[in-house]
Every structure is written in structure tokens, then in C-alpha cells.
From Swiss-Prot:
Entry EC number(s): 4.1.1.37
Catalytic activity, as annotated: uroporphyrinogen III + 4 H(+) = coproporphyrinogen III + 4 CO2
Residues where substrate binds: 27-31, 77, 154, 209, 330
Name of the featured protein: Uroporphyrinogen decarboxylase
Originating organism: Acinetobacter baumannii (strain ATCC 17978 / DSM 105126 / CIP 53.77 / LMG 1025 / NCDC KC755 / 5377)
Coiled coil segments of this chain: none
Metabolic or biological pathway, per its Swiss-Prot or TrEMBL entry: Porphyrin-containing compound metabolism; protoporphyrin-IX biosynthesis; coproporphyrinogen-III from 5-aminolevulinate: step 4/4
Family according to the record: Belongs to the uroporphyrinogen decarboxylase family.
HAMAP family membership: URO_D (MF_00218)
Swiss-Prot/TrEMBL keywords: Cytoplasm, Decarboxylase, Lyase, Porphyrin biosynthesis
Binding partners and assembly: Homodimer.
Known role: Catalyzes the decarboxylation of four acetate groups of uroporphyrinogen-III to yield coproporphyrinogen-III.
Gene Ontology MF annotations: uroporphyrinogen decarboxylase activity
Length: 357
């Protein structure tokens, strides 16, 4: 494999010294970029974009041409696993992802096939290996999956939801059925992420996008415990380097202490949790990632710089000089001016030097 020219992202996740704060952005390859929209138009639709190796590689690399980012993230979707399990993923304009089938009964769970990620999701693995090769060691490549809880919400609801009516009904009325589904999904995610690592992913993020919809005990029982199982089942070293794992529960800032028990190397934060508070809670046991409100990028250059500097001041307030990766607190939105993220990225690199230089 090609020698990695910029490894500060991996080093920060492992709480090793860095020369400047590494940064990447959730959803950095996305609709806010005109070149992304052009490529998606060529592909025809979102799923075709994900499943075409050449297009998936192209859109992964696009933000790296514009911004001085310290990591690339595989362009794909968290719902590839449910799709491969036979639920029939499709997208309706303005309504987000939907499935032709739902999973709502014990028999539905029993009918789910065992995932063979290398065969069933070969297009993802082809994309990972192609992107890794195209990067040429420029920056590390992040692989990812949704958490079992988050995947289950889509599978039970049949698409996106704000109330999770059917999933929570299952959780309280038939918890054993939900546990069976989550266990099946945890095994699927382990296979999927290990296949990504074999294909060339150098770090992993688990997106627990809907963990924040749960009460405390339910979060631990139905989300966190399954992420713990996944991390215990992952290949943690490849080509002589550790494969760091990031857990990101949106709305999960109150659960940092239990999250540490997952075995993750780093915890992602949304913008509702102050970084200095989070630093004090984790006390150097894990790295942190985040957590600029994506809406900040709607502002002026001066307001973006001010917000980024305040974020970095919080991140380094307790004197720690590493164990931090700058990011947004959630995905960048399609309405952001492509000029604005450059201000974010450059300010992170320039201003953090006062703490790390």
C-alpha cells in the first residue's frame, strides 16, 4: 500500500501528537457542490451514483480538490445493508428513503438472510478499493455504517420517521423481537465494516443518527450495547496501523460516559454539547470529534471564523494538545455556499497552531 502522506487524522483519533487540528466534514461530498450535482445527474439517481464505482470515487474526491481536508469518507449510504437484506430501497423526491418491505414481526426478522457483505455489497467494496487507490496516500479513507438501532428504525418504519411509532411500539411491546433484529443487524454491520477494512478503509465511523430519540435506559439497551458488540467484532489493525473507530450518536452528548465503554477510539459530538464540557467528562480516555453547527456556514466569513475559533478554544481549554478532530455537528446542508467550508477548514488549521505549535 502507498505510504500515507498526511496521517494527522488517524493520529488525533489515537490521541497522538499532531501539528495542527485535523478536519473533515460529515456529508462533505454532497449536493452543495455543483460538481457533485453534475456527477449525480450523469448517474441518473442517487442509488445509481452509489452503485457505480467510477462515480462514487469521483464524488468522494471532489471535496478534497476544493478544501484542505485531512480525511476522505466513502461515498455511500447507511441503508445499503437493509437493501442487501432484501427490503428494496428506493428514494422518492422530497420524501427521502423508503423500503418496499418492512420488518415488524418475529417472522419478518426470521426471514432476513445472513449478509455476506463482500458478495452482497461488492459495489461498496469496489468503491472503497478504487477510492483508496485514487487517493494515493494523500489522506486516510473513512469507512462507515449506520448503527443497528438507526438501521432498525428505517426497516421497521419503512423509511424516515420523526416519531418512530412502529419501532418504539416494538421496543416496548415486543422487546425480544427488536433485540433479535438488532442482533442480526449487529452481525451484518460487523461483516460489512470488516469487508470495508479489508478493501482499504483506514478508519471507521458508526452513525447512530437516531440514538438521541431514546430514553437513557433504552439507549443503553437498544443502541449502545449493539455498537459495543460491533466494535468488539471489528478488525482493529491493518498494514501495521490501528484502525480507529468513531461512534457518533446525534443528540447523545449526555451519554459520553457510557459511550466510552463501547471500545471506540473517539466520540462524535453534535453542536448541543460544549466541547470543553465533553473534554472534562472523557478526561483523555477517548478522542472527540465535532461539533460546529452546520448552520454556521450560512454566515459571513467573519462570523464563521469567530464560531470556529470559539469551538477550538473550547476544544483545547483544558490543556490537552491532541485527541481532537474538527468537524461539523451533523452533515453539511445542500444550501451552503461552497466558498464557506474553505473558511471553516482553513481557520481550523491556522488557528489551532496557537495551541499545537
Amino acid at each position: 500500500m502507498t505510504t500515507l502522506k498526511n496521517d494527522r487524522f488517524l493520529r488525533a483519533l489515537l490521541r497522538e501528537p499532531v501539528d495542527t487540528t485535523p478536519i473533515w466534514m460529515m456529508r462533505q461530498a454532497g449536493r452543495y457542490l455543483p460538481e457533485y450535482r453534475e456527477t449525480r445527474s450523469k448517474a441518473g439517481d442517487f442509488l445509481s451514483l452509489c452503485k457505480n464505482t467510477e462515480f462514487a470515487c469521483e464524488v468522494t474526491l471532489q471535496p478534497l480538490r476544493r478544501y484542505d481536508l485531512d480525511a476522505a469518507i466513502l461515498f455511500s449510504d447507511i441503508l445499503t445493508i437493509p437493501d442487501a437484506l432484501g427490503l428494496g430501497l428506493y428514494f422518492e423526491t422530497g420524501e427521502g428513503p423508503k423500503f418496499h418491505k418492512t420488518v415488524r414481526t418475529e417472522q419478518d426478522v426470521a426471514n432476513l438472510p445472513k449478509l455476506n457483505a463482500k458478495a452482497d455489497l461488492d459495489y461498496v467494496m469496489n468503491a472503497v478499493s478504487t477510492i483508496r487507490s485514487a487517493l494515493g496516500g494523500q489522506v486516510p479513507l473513512i469507512g462507515f455504517s449506520g448503527s443497528p438501532w438507526t438501521l432498525a428504525t428505517y426497516m421497521v418504519e419503512g423509511g424516515s420517521s420523526k416519531e418512530f411509532r412502529f419501532t418504539k411500539q416494538m421496543m416496548y411491546a415486543q422487546p425480544e423481537v427488536l433485540h433479535a433484529l438488532l442482533d442480526h443487524l449487529a452481525d451484518s454491520v460487523i461483516d460489512y465494516l470488516n469487508a470495508q477494512i479489508d478493501a482499504g478503509a483506514q478508519a471507521i465511523q458508526i452513525f447512530d443518527s437516531w440514538g438521541g430519540a431514546l430514553a437513557h435506559r433504552e439507549y443503553v439497551e437498544f443502541s449502545l450495547n449493539y455498537m459495543k458488540k460491533i466494535i468488539a467484532g471489528l478488525q482493529r489493525e491493518k498494514d501495521g496501523r490501528r484502525i480507529p473507530v468513531i461512534v457518533f450518536t446525534k443528540g447523545g452528548g449526555q451519554w459520553l460516559e457510557p459511550m466510552i465503554t463501547t471500545g471506540a477510539d473517539a466520540l462524535g459530538l453534535d453542536w448541543t454539547t460544549p466541547l470543553n464540557t465533553a473534554r472534562n467528562v472523557v478526561s483523555g480516555r477517548v478522542a472527540l470529534q465535532g461539533n460546529l453547527d452546520p448552520a454556521v456556514l450560512y454566515g459571513s466569513a467573519a462570523s464563521i471564523e469567530k464560531a470556529v475559533k470559539a469551538m477550538l478554544d473550547d476544544a483545547y481549554a483544558n490543556g490537552e494538545k491532541t485527541g481532537y478532530v474538527a468537524n461539523l455537528g451533523h452533515g453539511i446542508t445542500q444550501w451552503v455556499d461552497p466558498a464557506q467550508p474553505k473558511i471553516f477548514v482553513d481557520t481550523v488549521h491556522e488557528y489551532s497552531a496557537k495551541y499545537l505549535g
